[in-house]
């Protein structure tokens, strides 16, 4: 089947009214259109990005975010959905705009990211003058949802209350990370 026909059918699937979640035993999993496992091999590399909101959102498996400088006004710079992502050598800077009321603020968010690797990145929070108290809303460097066997190594977290936040379903191996809370 030609690629444009496959893409057209996929777009139609995404726009049809379907339940977004289904019950499977005791846990909830995303239904067919929310399957992040097909390999997409997207790569964002050697970029300088400044954004008012999220700079990168990728869905699919085997994606790479490497050697970028990403600066955003909000609280989340990158959101990745899907397994086996590689995030390495980046500098993430967030300015913590208090108008951004996203729940569980984190510079890097991963969902269903089994087997992902996050290494040798720098996570920096620069608070807006409007931001009143450091304790108002704990900012995480990395937030994991439903993500198992994630390796987090060699990262530096600056002015971040919680370097890694994860739900009960997520598991990590963490080593060589540094927290600078000046």
Role assignments for model-derived ranges:
Residues 1-37, 50-55, 60, 72-79, ...:
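Extracellular beta-strand/beta-solenoid scaffold signature
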Residues 3, 19, 24, 46-47, ...:
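Consensus "Asn ladder" position of solenoid repeat domains
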Residues 7-11, 15-16, 37-39, 43-44, ...:
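Parallel beta-helix/beta-solenoid
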Residues 138-139, 150-182:
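Predominantly polar beta-repeat domains that present long G/T/S/D/N-rich surfaces used to bind, process
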Residues 71-72, 76, 84-86, 93, ...:
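Short, surface-exposed, polar/charged, turn-prone segments marking secondary-structure boundaries
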Residues 48, 53, 61-62, 69, ...:
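Position-specific detector for the leucine-rich repeat
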């Amino acid at each position: 089947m030609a690629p444009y026909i496959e893409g057209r059918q996929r777009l139609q699937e995404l726009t049809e009214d379907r339940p977004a979640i289904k019950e499977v035993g005791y846990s909830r999993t995303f239904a067919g259109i929310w399957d992040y496992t097909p390999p997409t091999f997207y790569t964002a590399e050697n970029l300088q990005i400044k954004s008012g909101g999220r700079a990168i959102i990728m869905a699919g498996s085997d994606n790479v975010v490497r050697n970028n400088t990403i600066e955003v006004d909000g609280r989340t710079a990158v959101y990745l959905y899907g397994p086996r992502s590689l995030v390495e050598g980046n500098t993430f800077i967030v300015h913590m705009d208090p108008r951004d009321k996203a729940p569980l603020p984190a510079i890097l968010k991963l969902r269903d990211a089994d087997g992902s690797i996050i290494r040798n990145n720098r996570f920096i929070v620069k608070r807006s003058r409007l931001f009143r108290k450091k304790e108002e809303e704990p900012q995480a460097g990395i937030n994991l949802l439903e993500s198992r066997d994630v390796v987090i190594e060699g990262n530096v977290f600056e002015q971040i209350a919680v370097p890694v936040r994860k739900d009960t379903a997520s598991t990590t191996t963490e080593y060589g990370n540094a927290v600078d809370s000046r």
